[in-house]
């Protein structure tokens, strides 16, 4: 039976903003034994030891992730997917749906059981539909506890939904006007772009929660009826549902994903519900709707405001350094090798790396 995780004990809810410090020594998933363990950089979102990103060290925990998603969804129409933390001063936590499958194994007289726990499953679905959905996801990406799929999900939560894209307290050095700009930025995307995909059988998107409401189409998107074996509007022929991305058929007995901001005439195969920019599956079905397509949080934010290539945070100042399609806070226009400020000095940008001439030459040799 599917279960919902509700770790709401206030005694374990207190998170430290110095999480990086407490995560010292965590092994790097990319470097394996070559990295001595996570050593936080003072302002870059990387390990000083191996130069890999924070997400390669999987610094977050289930509780960290649930609080982050809870904060993201609060004050939006998806707040029903969150729960208030008792004594938490208005803090909300994600009601993450976990699915536990227990299968008996016939081995002699005493029965044993094989238990599989999915660390996340689509919300609001039956166990049967949830399992059908999981079977359509590549095995290496299924979020089963203790597997590469579970690690993949956690890394994607960090990459696609950075905490510093929604929480000003996780950003470094925002001045008053930048803080106000960020608050308006977050408020706007929660109201106009943020969404959570819904898993249902073709033709059943929006039901029963929306069955008594008129489905509204977001401005700028088109609503088209499902194709009917090549002939629109013929009631004598069976309805054929088509995936919005690959244009392949969606069998009526196989789950698809709906995005309410797209309208319920559109559906995606589970593996096709991905960011239009990076083509990565949208983690936990969380999307941002823009220009008629779903985006991950990271790339949606970057499409609206520039992101600093140094600290990885969104830039809310109008005074920043830009080189081609890359941007930096003025104070972060710094060589990635020797850490000297490069404003007004010679520099070289190679494969996204900002280097002074000396470090660039050393790197090539």
Swiss-Prot record:
Residue stretches making up the LIM zinc-binding domain: 241-306, 307-365
Cellular component, GO, one term: cytoplasm
Biased composition (Polar residues): 221-231
PROSITE patterns from the UniProt entry: LIM_DOMAIN_1, LIM_DOMAIN_2, PET
Compositional bias of kind Basic and acidic residues: 208-220
GO-annotated molecular function: transcription corepressor activity; zinc ion binding
Tissue expression pattern: Expressed in distal airway epithelium of the lung, vascular smooth muscle, and myocardium.
Region feature Disordered, mapped onto this chain: 200-231
Phosphoserine: residues bearing it: 16
Superkingdom, taxonomy of origin: Eukaryota
Xref: Pfam families: LIM, PET
Knockout mutant characteristics: Mice display a marked increase in cardiac hypertrophy.
GO biological processes: negative regulation of transcription by RNA polymerase II; positive regulation of calcineurin-NFAT signaling cascade; regulation of cardiac muscle hypertrophy
Localisation: Cytoplasm; Nucleus
Principal location class: cytoplasm
Leader peptide range in chain numbering: none
PET domain mapped to chain residues: 99-206
Entry keyword set: Cytoplasm, LIM domain, Metal-binding, Nucleus, Phosphoprotein, Repeat, Repressor, Transcription, Transcription regulation, Zinc
Note on domains (UniProt): The LIM zinc-binding domains and the Cys-rich region mediate interaction with GATA6.
Free-text function comment from the UniProt entry: Transcriptional cofactor that restricts GATA6 function by inhibiting DNA-binding, resulting in repression of GATA6 transcriptional activation of downstream target genes. Represses GATA6-mediated trans activation of lung- and cardiac tissue-specific promoters. Inhibits DNA-binding by GATA4 and GATA1 to the cTNC promoter. Plays a critical role in the development of cardiac hypertrophy via activation of calcineurin/nuclear factor of activated T-cells signaling pathway.
Subunit structure: Interacts with beta-dystroglycan. Interacts with GATA1, GATA4 and GATA6.
Protein name: LIM and cysteine-rich domains protein 1
């Amino acid at each position: 039976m599917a279960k919902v995780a509700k770790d709401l004990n206030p005694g374990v809810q207190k998170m430290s903003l110095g999480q990086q410090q407490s995560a010292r020594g965590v092994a790097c998933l990319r470097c394996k034994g070559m990295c001595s363990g996570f050593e936080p950089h003072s302002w870059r979102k990387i390990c000083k030891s191996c130069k890999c990103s924070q997400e390669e060290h999987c610094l977050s925990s289930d509780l960290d992730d649930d609080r982050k998603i809870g904060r993201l969804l609060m004050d939006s129409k998806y707040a029903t997917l969150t729960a208030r933390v008792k004594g938490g001063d208005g803090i909300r936590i994600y009601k993450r749906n976990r699915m536990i499958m227990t299968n008996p194994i016939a081995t002699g007289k005493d029965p044993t059981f094989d238990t599989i726990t999915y660390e996340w499953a689509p919300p609001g679905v039956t166990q049967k539909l949830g399992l059908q959905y999981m079977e359509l996801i590549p095995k290496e990406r299924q979020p089963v506890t203790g597997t590469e799929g579970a690690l993949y999900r956690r890394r994607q939560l960090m990459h696609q939904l950075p905490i510093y894209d929604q929480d000003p307290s996780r950003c470094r050095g925002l001045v008053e006007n930048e803080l106000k700009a960020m608050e308006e930025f977050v408020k706007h995307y929660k109201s106009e772009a943020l969404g959570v995909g819904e898993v249902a059988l073709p033709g059943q998107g929006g039901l029963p929660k929306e069955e008594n409401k008129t489905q509204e189409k977001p401005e700028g998107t088109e609503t088209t009826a499902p194709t009917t074996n090549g002939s629109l509007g013929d009631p004598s022929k069976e309805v054929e549902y088509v995936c919005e991305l690959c244009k392949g058929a969606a069998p009526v007995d196989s789950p698809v994903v709906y995005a309410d901001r797209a309208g319920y005439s559109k559906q995606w195969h589970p593996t096709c519900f991905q960011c239009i920019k990076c083509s990565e599956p949208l983690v936990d079905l969380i999307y941002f709707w823009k220009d008629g397509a779903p985006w991950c949080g990271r790339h949606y934010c970057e499409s609206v405001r520039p992101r600093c290539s140094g600290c990885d945070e969104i830039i809310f100042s109008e005074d920043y350094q830009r080189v081609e399609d890359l941007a930096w806070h003025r104070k972060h226009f710094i060589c990635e090798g020797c850490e000297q400020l490069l404003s007004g000095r010679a520099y070289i940008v190679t494969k996204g790396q900002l280097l002074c001439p000396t470090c660039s030459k050393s790197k090539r040799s």
